[in-house]
Amino acid sequence: MSQAEAITDTGEIESVSGPVVTATGLDAQMNDVVYVGDEGLMGEVIEIEGDVTTIQVYEETSGIGPGQPVDNTGEPLTVDLGPGMLDSIYDGVQRPLDVLEDEMGAFLDRGVDAPGIDLDTDWEFEPTVEAGDEVAAGDVVGTVDETVSIEHKVLVPPRSDGGEVVAVESGTFTVDDTVVELDTGEEIQMHQEWPVRRQRPTVDKQTPTEPLVSGQRILDGLFPIAKGGTAAIPGPFGSGKTVTQQSLAKFADADIVVYIGCGERGNEMTEVIEDFPELPDPQTGNPLMARTTLIANTSNMPVAARESCIYTGITIAEYYRDMGYDVALMADSTSRWAEAMREISSRLEEMPGEEGYPAYLAARLSEFYERAGYFENFNGTEGSISVIGAVSPPGGDFSEPVTQNTLRIVKTFWALDSDLAERRHFPAINWDESYSLYKDQLDPWFTDNVVDDWAEQRQWAVDILDEESELEEIVQLVGKDALPEDQQLTLEVARYIREAWLQQNALHDVDRYCPPEKTYAILSGIKTLHEESFEALDAGVPVEEITSIDAAPRLNRLGTTPDDEHEAEVAEIKQQITEQLRELY
């Protein structure tokens, strides 16, 4: 839809304050999209008071001033949904950056626009309905091979009244061609639009019972997230938020990944664009970009568009969820989104809340995270959206408003620790501060699909790490050698849990992804060391001899053992540990 076709009425600018513009003479409604100034800068109505309309503009506003026109479209901010979104990169209002770069180079002109999906590409449509079939909102009417990994399901729009199919075609079509006609006169295309601030409807929201397997041992082993769950990754500068997010985007067992770079550095998005096409999806072996949509709203792009990029991403995620896919959405970082809200709020001269953030910060965060979940769709399928948001508290202070409000909402908390990062322990997730409220509902899945004693093994590791934390304070006062021998041995076992199990190299070809079976196997090797060491200690063997066996250090190399060899390697190490320790008594 071009700007000219969309205009319903025109007003004029009254004042400009950064990204906030006030206009008069507009017959607008809240959240209407408007085009501001002679260049037609895209904006959104955020406040109406009498004849004065307040607009947040999604582009740099320098050069526009009072008296210039404001054109109202009469429509809310919407995204284009259809085949072609995967393997694409958008800005915060779903303008395709790769398409615009081809037209005008690395630096985009203001006021440019392009459809979110290519209207000229031909797609091979394969119908799944026949003339005479009854269809309703959300039903699948056909499929398109969108990428080598994903079959795109063409859906009856959610607002449709449905009806009987009177005509259906198979063959090659563009997204705007009619592929199905109903007896009501409604024509269904492969392309539909949806307002970003409105949640797409579903039949029911269900309790998630299956984990989103991340391939990160500390997450899958200690703090799992469910498919349809919510998680926050807060941490100070340099603690590994972005690397953790990227590892999840690369290796989580979701069908679709939506990665939102919200206010972060441009080179981080560049890294994603360079890495993802080269890396294989661990589930299918196809390129990762074949299941990924990127939304880039970096720190040097307009502040107001950060506010919309989060909603754009979650709406795209909901569309693929409606097809029955499991979607993982990474938002890096929600703090920059909150800062954008703070700036807009201050320009509007609203009453500030804590640290200058708007009073509605908690409500906006809740609206976003509550669109995650495990859902039953209208077409009988089940799909999920898992939302993982990075939080960037200034100075790593978890008591600031964005972290605290996020904590009240999410059910998984992965706290990154600068002390661990400085010790080069990555992922730098603090096991004392982190938690997952999904553990109990996910344990049956791990028991059925991985191993019977998954929960018991995890609890054993947690107990050892808790005991180590208590002993650390004593060690700092009197030294390790002053402890009883059994406590010295506990510290040694805890060291292996930290170094061999919790640490993981995101840059190593093998260690960057660890399947749950291998996660369990490595921990079982450490537990064997624990049990056999205490038996040797009970038999009178000095702790120095127990800790000097040469089989134990092999545990540290299990992470880099190829996945198809780890079972034999763990069994061999267990046998060596047992033999060497029993030789001592």
From Swiss-Prot:
Enzyme Commission code: 7.1.2.2
PROSITE patterns the UniProt entry points to: ATPASE_ALPHA_BETA
Subcellular location: Cell membrane
Keywords linked to the UniProt accession: ATP synthesis, ATP-binding, Cell membrane, Hydrogen ion transport, Ion transport, Membrane, Nucleotide-binding, Translocase, Transport
GO biological process: proton motive force-driven plasma membrane ATP synthesis; proton transmembrane transport
One Gene Ontology term of the molecular function aspect: proton-transporting ATP synthase activity, rotational mechanism
Topology in membrane: Peripheral membrane protein
Catalytic activity: ATP + H2O + 4 H(+)(in) = ADP + phosphate + 5 H(+)(out)
An annotated GO cellular component: proton-transporting two-sector ATPase complex, catalytic domain
Quaternary structure (record): Has multiple subunits with at least A(3), B(3), C, D, E, F, H, I and proteolipid K(x).
PANTHER family: H(+)-TRANSPORTING TWO-SECTOR ATPASE (PTHR43607:SF1), V-TYPE PROTON ATPASE CATALYTIC SUBUNIT A (PTHR43607)
Function statement: Component of the A-type ATP synthase that produces ATP from ADP in the presence of a proton gradient across the membrane. The A chain is the catalytic subunit.
Family statement: Belongs to the ATPase alpha/beta chains family.
Protein name: A-type ATP synthase subunit A
